[in-house]
Regions:
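Early extracytoplasmic/lumenal segment of secretory-pathway proteins
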Residues: 44-110
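Extracytoplasmic ligand-binding site segments that recognize negatively charged/polar headgroups
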Residues: 53-61, 97-236
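A ligand-binding cleft/hinge motif common to bilobed small-molecule-binding domains
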Residues: 106-110, 233, 238-257
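Short beta-strand->loop
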Residues: 117-126, 139-140, 166-169, 238-239, ...
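Periplasmic-binding protein-like
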Residues: 127-130, 145, 210-215, 221-222, ...
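A bilobed periplasmic-binding-protein/Venus flytrap-type ligand-binding module shared by bacterial periplasmic
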Residues: 148-155, 193-198, 270-283, 301-302
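Mature extracytoplasmic/periplasmic domains
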Residues: 277-334
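Extracellular/periplasmic bilobal clamshell ligand-binding domains
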Residues: 319-356
Length: 356
């Protein structure tokens, strides 16, 4: 096994420590909301299996602890990503193990098309925007992230914080910009769709994005295949195309001098969804989990993890103040999420052609 650099291990340790502190703070913050919920009389072995519920992503640790407190149901942590979760569901489709699953929006369409999910319309179903739920209830959004610029201001060497997609093409930012590979990372693809839509493209015309990426090559961008969060914190990457919740976590949890920017030309918001697994062995418990993540308490926990709750739940002034103003988020335009999913492979192929 390759040894990891000491600085990376130290960074990981600090992230874990801050994560624990954030989880405890979030649970304390929501104590009043949870106090009004009555736990069910559950046996110690009463569980609901969730695929792709990792404790360090979106603070699932706090959400799962709150589910246990409110319902008596234990949800084990699971570190799969969306693709791995779907592969596991396919392998187990004759004898399912999972009860619920958490997925990126593109993967939700795939899971539904493959017959891996069953219909369930949870409590607060009517609060979910129509475009962010399957009409039959096979999946529904629980929160979203908005694509923009995660900027480490200390690493800009005195240069101004970029405010637009056009700014990133300026030569002063040479060697400072990174985006995840859009052919292998969904957030990279989401960033490509964001710039394409902002510059007048569509799902039938990716040329604006392809031209923008071609021009960006003059600035020698860094293109990681996996998350680059720690590299932004260290200053190695001053500007990363990423979700807002990562930037807020860096600023408020890891206390980095990071700013999140929604570009002037516009961007997109990307939902993350959940659904009930077809043939779920503990479907009743799975339904209770799905009800909870959409409850006021559950939605406030997502906000405490710097995600945008799907429901318009009331937030504390402290929570609200940590997000950019609503006027900035108005630049995050809606997209057809079915088309977002359907056109992912086509964009990847077109992007690769421009790189050779």
């Amino acid at each position: 096994m390759t040894s990891l650099p000491g600085s990376f291990l130290l960074s990981r340790s600090r992230l874990r420590l801050c994560h624990v502190r954030n989880t405890l703070a979030a649970l304390a913050l929501l104590g009043g909301a949870l106090a009004g919920l009555h736990p069910t009389a559950a046996r110690a072995d009463e569980t609901a299996i969730c695929y792709n519920c990792p404790p360090e992503w979106a603070d699932w640790a706090a959400q799962i602890a709150a589910i246990r407190q409110a319902t008596g149901i234990r949800v084990p942590f699971d570190n799969k990503n969306s693709g791995q979760a779907i592969a596991q569901l396919m392998a187990e489709r004759k004898s399912p193990v999972a009860d619920v699953v958490y997925l990126g929006i593109s993967s939700a369409f795939q899971a539904s098309r493959m017959g891996l999910l069953q219909s369930y319309k949870p409590a607060h179903w009517d609060d979910i925007p129509t475009a962010q739920k399957d009409p039959q209830g096979q999946w529904f959004a629980i929160h979203s992230g908005t694509i923009g610029f995660m900027v480490n201001k200390d690493a800009l060497d005195g240069k101004p914080v970029p405010r637009s997609w056009a700014d990133l093409l300026k030569p002063e930012y040479k060697g400072m910009i990174a985006y995840l590979d859009p052919t292998s990372a969904f957030v990279g693809y989401a960033g490509a769709v964001a710039v394409n839509q902002a510059l007048g493209g569509s799902f039938d015309d990716f040329q604006p994005a392809l031209d923008w990426f071609a021009r960006l090559q003059a600035n020698q961008p860094i293109v990681p295949k996996q998350t680059a969060y720690a590299r932004v914190l260290s200053g190695e990457i001053p500007i990363l195309l990423d979700y807002d919740f990562d930037a807020y976590r860096a600023k408020y949890q890891d206390h980095a001098n990071v700013e999140f920017v929604i570009p002037r030309e516009g961007t997109i918001a990307v939902p993350y969804v959940m659904g009930l697994v077809k043939g779920a062995p503990d479907a009743a418990n799975g339904r209770k989990v799905l009800d909870f993540v959409l409850s006021d308490a559950g939605q406030k926990l997502w906000a405490a993890a710097y995600l945008r709750p799907v429901r318009p739940v009331p937030l504390t002034k402290e929570m609200s103040a940590r997000f950019l103003p609503a006027s900035d988020y108005a630049r995050a335009r809606p997209v057809d999420y079915q088309r977002l999913a359907d056109r992912q492979q086509a964009f990847g192929e077109a992007y690769l052609k421009t790189r050779h």
